[in-house]
Amino acid sequence: MKLEHPDRLMNRTPLSLAALETHDAFAERHIGPDAASQQAMLDTLGFASRAALIDAVIPASIRRNETLPLGPFSQPKSEAEALAALRALADKNQVFRSYIGQGYYDTHTPAVILRNVLENPAWYTAYTPYQPEISQGRLEALLNFQQMVTDLTGLAISNASLLDEATAAAEAMTLLQRVGKPKSNVFYVADDVLPQTLEVIRTRALPIGIDVKTGPAADAAQSNAFGVLLQYPGVNGDVRDYRALTDAIHAAGGHVVVAADLLALTVLTPPGEWGADVAVGNTQRFGVPMGFGGPHAAYLAVRDEFKRQMPGRLVGVTVDAQGKPALRLALQTREQHIRREKATSNVCTAQALLAIMASMYAVYHGPHGLKTIALRVNRIAALFAAGVKQLGFATVNDTFFDTVTVDTGARTAQVHAFANAKRINLRRVSDARVGVSIDETTTRDDLADLLAVFAQAAGGTAPSVDALDAGLGGEAALPASLVRTSAYLTHHVFNRHHSETEMLRYLRSLSDKDLALDRSMIPLGSCTMKLNATSEMLPVTWPEFGRIHPFAPAEQTVGYREMIDQLEQMLVAATGYAAVSLQPNAGSQGEYAGLLIIHAYHASRGEGHRDVCLIPASAHGTNPASAHMAGMKVVVVACDAQGNVDIADLKAKAEQHSANLAAIMITYPSTHGVFEQNVREICEIVHAHGGQVYVDGANMNAMVGLTAPGQFGGDVSHLNLHKTFCIPHGGGGPGVGPVAVGAHLAKFLPNQRSTGYTRGEDGIGAVSAAPYGSASILPISWMYIAMMGAKNLTAATETAILNANYIAKRLAPHYPVLYSGPGGLVAHECILDLRPIKESSGITVDDVAKRLMDYGFHAPTMSFPVPGTLMVEPTESESKEELDRFIDAMIAIRDEIRAVEEGRADREDNPLRHAPHTAAVVTANEWPHAYSREQAAYPVASLGTNKYWPPVGRADNAYGDRNLFCACVPMSDYA
C-alpha cells in the first residue's frame, strides 16, 4: 500500500492509532516510485490507473482474481515486527559445539571481512562480472580465490567457485567422462568419501548412464573406471598416501579426482604433486559460517590440459585498450548461455560472494597464519587421540589431520548422551564408533570438555590437556611422507594485508572499482536486480542461523525447520503449486531437479522411455543444458515473428514425438518480455501428448499476485529467490532455486537418504550436499514476504510492469522495442533492437554497453535472447528519477550515434567506440580524439555531482582467451 502524505494526516482529526502505525510499512521503502510518480508514468502510457494497465498487459484467461493466500503472513509486518518474529524462530535453534565434521566446520569469520564484505552492499548487490570494466574489484577477489586454490591443490588452474563440494565432485565426474577412456561408463568412488557427496554423484550419474561403483580405494585401479574419486583426508579422518594408487589408475587408463580439505593442504602434500588430475572441495572453513548447510563456495581445479572442459566461471587476465592489465571472465564459450545443451555444465549462478569471503580469509591470514591454524587444529586432534587412548578407547585411524574416529563399542550411546549434556555434537559413525572433528574455534577448554565426555563414559578421570601436551612432545599424526614441503600463497597479495588497517583499505579499494546497486540501477533483463533491503540481510549473520551444522540433531534445528516450512508455504501460495523443496541451491539446480522429478513421474507410470524435451528457440541456455544433464533429448520449437511459441510448430513437434514426449520447458512471461496469450493452449497441447509442463520461474517477478504457473497449466517450476524474492546476487552467487510442483509430483521431491532426510516417498536423490541447500540465506526471502504481505507483493509486481512499460514507451522513438503484446505493451522487461543502428553507423551493442559505463550505468542484458539487442528490466525498486536518468542516458547515446550516422562524428573516433573512458585517459597530457574530454567523461550534466570512473578501459576479450592466464598478476605488470 502507498501511504498518505503526513501533511494530510495531520489535518485529519482525530488521528487514529491505526493510521499512524502504517508509517512503518516496509512496502514504501521497497517500491521505488511513490504514488505521484506512478501516476505520472501512467499518464505517459495513457492509463488512468495501475489496475487498468495490468488488465491490458496480462491475459484475462490466466489472471489470478483472489488475494495471495499467505495465511498468517497476509498482512505486512513492520521491519521491527518481522525481525522480532524471526528472532523468535531463531531462538528455537540450539547452538551446540559441533564436532560432526563430514565436510562442515565451525570457523571464525574475521570481523573486517564480516563487516566489509558480507554486510557491505558494494559486494553483495553486484551482478556477475560479465561487464569486466566495471567489475575489476570482485574479479580481482575471485582471481585471488583461483590463486589460493591452485596453490593449495598443486594443480594448474581453478575455476571461480561451484555450488558445494558434492556438486563439484559430480561436475568432475562428468568432466572426466568427456575426456576419459571411451569404452568405460564406470565411475569409482572410494568408500571413505563423504556420504552426501556419493549421493549427489549417484543422482547425477543415473540419467546419463554412468555406473557408479563403490569400494575400498585400494581396489580402484582394477575397476576399469574412466574416473576415480578419492577423499583426502577420508571421512573418518585417515590420511593415506595415494601415489602408487594414482599411478596404477593412470596406467589402467583412468583419471583421478581428489576431494581435498583446503586447510589440510597447508600441511599435507597437495594432490597435484602426487598425480591427481582434478581436485574438488569446499572452502567453507575459510571464514564462512556453516549456516545449516550453506551457502559455501566449492572449488574445482584441474591439470592444464583440461582447462577448456572446466565447468563454472573462470577469471582470466587480459589487457585493456591502453595495454594495461585488466581482468575478465575467460573461455565463456564453455558456458550454458552460449553452448546450451553442449555446455560443460548447466551452472549459471555459483557462489561468488562466498568465494570472495574465503579468498579474503586467505589474504588476511596469509600462508603463515593459515598454517598456524592448521597446525593448532592438528595438535588438538592429536591431544584428543592421545587422551582417549589413555582412557582405554581405541582409535580407528592412527593418521589424521583433524578427525579422529573412536571405537566406543557398547559405550557409544553413553558417549553421545554425555556429550549432549555438555551441548556437544559428535558424529554418529555407527552403533560402535564415534567421530570427532576439530576446527579452528576449538579451544583447550573445549578439548577438556571432550575428554571429560569420554572419561565419563569410561568411568575414569580425564587427563589434563597440559599433561597430554607435555607427553606428546613434537609428534604429529601426519604421515612423514605426506608432510607438505612446497611453498604456497607466495604472491604479494597474500603477504601484505595482515593488519586490519591494510585489510580494510584493500577491501575498500576493490569495492570502489565496481558498479553495484549501491551506486546505480542495474537494468539487466532476466536478472531482476531489485532492492536487497538491509533488514532482510541482518538475520544472515545471526549465530542461531550461522553456527548450525547441517547434520545437527533435529531437536536443535526446530526454528530453522519451522522457518523453512513457512517459506515453502509462502512460495506455494505465490506459485499456485502444491509443494516446494528448498534443497536446490541455484536456479540451474532447481531446473535439473524439476526435470528429474518429471522423469521419475513418467517412470512410476511405466513410461520411463519418455525422454524428449521441447524447448522454444528463445529459451535461456540453462534450459537445454539442464535437459541434457537429465538425460533428455532436446527438440527445439520455433518462435513466430512476434516472439511467441509457434503453435503450429509446437503441435507438429508434439505429434511427432508423442510416444516419447517427456516435457516442454517454457519461460513465462517469455524471454522476449511478453505475456503470451496462448500459454494455456501450449500446456494443453503438451498434456494431450502425455508430457509435463515445466515453467521456468526466472520471470516470476512479473507474476506474483497476478497469475500463477500452477494455475494456468504448469506442472513444475523452479524459482530464483535471488531474483524475485530479494536474495542478493552477490556478484555471481549465492542463489537459491526452489523447485515447486503440482500435487501429482509432490512425492518425487528430492530426499537426502544419506542423512535420513526424506521429503518425497518416492523422491529423487539429493541434488545438493545439504538437505536444505543454502539454508542460511533463506531468512532473506522470509523477511521480504513477511514485511510485504499479500497486497504489497502484488503491488510490487504491478510496479515492475509499470516501470518496464514506462521505459519502453519513452525509448521507443529512439530504439525499436522488438517484441510487445497487445497494445504495444510489455511485461516486466523490454528488448531494445540495436541491429538497425549497427547497419547505419557501425556502432555495436557492445559499444553502447561500454558507453553506458561513462554515464554511470551497468548495461542491460546484451544479445539475449536476440543477438544485437539490449534487454532492460528495471524492477519495482527503482524510482522514477532513476528511470529517467537511465532513459536520458540512452537518448543521449542515441544522439551520439546519430552524429555518426550523419557524418558529424567519425565512424571510429567517437565516444562510443572508445568507451569506457578512464580518469587516467581523460586527464592524460595527450588527447588524440576529435571529440572533447568533457563529452567523453561528462556527457550529461548530472554526472558533475555523481561520477563513477571505470578503473580500466575496454577489455580485450580475444587477447585474454588467446593468452589464457588465470592467476594473480605480478605488481610489475601494473607499473
From Swiss-Prot:
Disulfide pairings: none
One GO molecular-function entry: glycine binding
Residue numbers bearing the N6-(pyridoxal phosphate)lysine modification: 723
A Pfam family of this chain: GDC-P
Catalytic activity, as annotated: N(6)-[(R)-lipoyl]-L-lysyl-[glycine-cleavage complex H protein] + glycine + H(+) = N(6)-[(R)-S(8)-aminomethyldihydrolipoyl]-L-lysyl-[glycine-cleavage complex H protein] + CO2
Annotated Gene3D superfamilies: Aspartate Aminotransferase, domain 1, Type I PLP-dependent aspartate aminotransferase-like (Major domain)
Top-level EC class: oxidoreductase
Annotated coiled-coil segments of the chain: none
Required cofactor names: pyridoxal 5'-phosphate
EC number: 1.4.4.2
Cellular component, GO annotation: cytosol; glycine cleavage complex
UniProt keyword Membrane present: no
CDD domains: GDC-P (cd00613)
Gene Ontology biological-process annotations: glycine decarboxylation via glycine cleavage system
UniProt keywords, alphabetically: Oxidoreductase, Pyridoxal phosphate
Family affiliation: Belongs to the GcvP family.
General function of this protein: The glycine cleavage system catalyzes the degradation of glycine. The P protein binds the alpha-amino group of glycine through its pyridoxal phosphate cofactor; CO(2) is released and the remaining methylamine moiety is then transferred to the lipoamide cofactor of the H protein.
Cross-referenced HAMAP family: GcvP
Subunit field text: The glycine cleavage system is composed of four proteins: P, T, L and H.
Record protein name field: Glycine dehydrogenase (decarboxylating)
